[in-house]
Amino acid sequence: MAAARPIILRFESRNGQFRLSVSPQEQFPLLQEKILENLPKDVEPSSLVLSNKPIGTGGQERQLKDLAGVSIERVGLKHGDKLFIGYQDKQASQAAPAHKHVTADVSRRLNGAPVPETETVTFHPPTSPSATIKNPWEVVQQSPLDDMLDKKDGKIYRPRDPKMCNHGPKGMCDYCMPLEPYDPKYLAEKKIKHLSFHSYMRKVNATTNKAELKSSFMPPLNEPYYRVRRDCPSGHPPWPEGICTKCQPSAISLQPQEFRMVDHVEFASPDLINSLLDFWRKSGAQRLGFLYGTYEEYTEVPLGIKAVVQAIYEPPQVDEIDGITLHEWPNEKEVDEVARQCGLEKVGVIFTDLLDAGRGDGSVVCKRHIDSYYLSSLEIAFASRMQAKHPKATKWSRTGRFGSNFVTCVLSGDEEGAITVSSYQASISAVEMVRADIVEPSAEPSVMLVQSEDDDTDNKSRYIPEVFYRKINEYGVSAQQNAKPSFPVEYLLVTLTHGFPTEASPMFSASTFPIENREVIGESQELRHVAKKLVSHGDPDKAIREVSDFHLLCFLHSLSMFSKEEEALLCRVATTHDPTEGLKLLNTPGWATLVTVLQESGERPPKRPWLNPADPPRPLSQQGKRHLSSRPESPKSESEQLAKRFKGASLE
């Protein structure tokens, strides 16, 4: 049998590239001498590593000495294929641990200063920008609202202008032709400060995918990435051992964001705000709650989106006069599941920042205004983390996600001393800067600090790119400023509008059940409160009405008395108020179990009221006489009578 023709294999190391002519039947350990001839003289032969990808980027790295008996053709290498080589020099191999394959031939350096080898270097794990999705418009599942807005043309139609239009009723000219949803003149005329998300997407898409170019479609949206790329193709060791112009982030130029992911926040009922304010009125401490609701179309803005808040859940927290400390929320997933069965999702967060003015008229101090701040640097960092936890899925982004619909609301005093709601979102750049650990909150609430690479108190090796922003200087000229050490928080903020519906029709009609995690002011959720709300006294409609309370639903879920089907029925009754579904609920085994638990715990419905002695005696019917007994009842018969009376309250 004739010998196989030799092939050319390409090799790349951090010292450069070279080629070798090898036989397909040749085994890998036999290549060691040829490889060492093309490497520096101080290379430790036993440290040679081969990989199909650059060293340190997640490829299949194998020690050359471990490939004994493995031929080149066995692993499928062909003529012209490329392999990557990693190695240690002899001095480094003597000092380094045995399991460490690759180290830099120079000491680790951070901002020019050497980093000790014993130091643990931590990285932020979020996905690299290279993790793009092939054809995201076919794979990514958007929300039904986004799909509906995508199908709309978004044009702003104008009537015929009788003064400027010289054509007939079926004609069209520049004065009456439809406008794009991102038309700047229309936005200025309607005093719309920010583009809606779908308007911005169409504006970017118009420049990215021009019809006249007839090129393949490219997703127009791409989130910023301010971290060192972990998958650099240059072949050097990963950061902080090595860095190049391909993997280091570019300088950041901050500017106000021209669009917003959500345009409006609508509270279904003023009672939602009043219940949160009641805690501050009773304790004087601040309070935080998460907003549960839905996203709907907002017609006041072209292709707009609004968050409709239906419930506020208050997680475990420690409240003080000047701040809030959030504790671990152990039942967060359970609350999210109850909200999901009600057709809701977590749409935002709201917190108070109130201080009584001391006038005795209910007025509060105005802390947030144009000369101070609207959202502090600490609050922006908190909002950024919340938005990073709730990304928005969209098929118009290369990574399948872009921004977040999560909103942040503040209850504080205005210039007139009244309590008002303000709604905000952190910008896309703010979320990425917080994720990349580039900025940190300041003691001065109106400014954000830029991290320093020299600050290694947290044992982190971070790369901080240059950050710039533009401002009007003392000469009235827009000049670029270096953001170090701090810059105004307005560059990281997007304002939203808010309001209440003209005719309130909240999803949950009842709001008298105690709110969770309020033991500090003497309010707690107990079984007696359940009995008080659900006892119908012969009126089943009362129980159906009173079950429409989000806090009651969460409490009943924690009791684990209902099956999944019964709990879904319970949530449907609470949200739709359907009497037919309500009667089905009252006859389920789970409801009977609830009645039994209330009975055995002593939480029984109140007895029928005693007759006033001044009232005339009521005649006793023959049916009632049959229930009378001349002998005293045994404890057993008494409990049976109480059970029958409780059953007659139409709880089941």
From Swiss-Prot:
GO terms for molecular function: ubiquitin binding; ubiquitin protein ligase binding. GO terms for biological process: mRNA transport; protein transport; ubiquitin-dependent protein catabolic process. GO terms for cellular component: endoplasmic reticulum membrane; nuclear membrane; perinuclear region of cytoplasm. Keywords: Cytoplasm, Endoplasmic reticulum, Membrane, mRNA transport, Nucleus, Protein transport, Translocation, Transport. Residues 633-643 have a biased composition (Basic and acidic residues). The keyword Aminoacyl-tRNA synthetase does not apply. It is found in: Cytoplasm, Perinuclear region; Endoplasmic reticulum membrane; Nucleus membrane. It is a peripheral membrane protein. Residues 601-652 are annotated as: Disordered. InterPro entries: MPN (IPR037518), Npl4 (IPR016563), NPL4_C (IPR007717), NPL4_Zn-bd_put (IPR007716), Ubiquitin-like_domsf (IPR029071). Residues 265-402 form the MPN domain. Belongs to the NPL4 family. Involved in the import of nuclear-targeted proteins into the nucleus and the export of poly(A) RNA out of the nucleus. Has a role in the endoplasmic reticulum-associated degradation (ERAD) pathway. This is Nuclear protein localization protein 4. It comes from Neosartorya fischeri (strain ATCC 1020 / DSM 3700 / CBS 544.65 / FGSC A1164 / JCM 1740 / NRRL 181 / WB 181) (Aspergillus fischerianus). The gene is npl4.
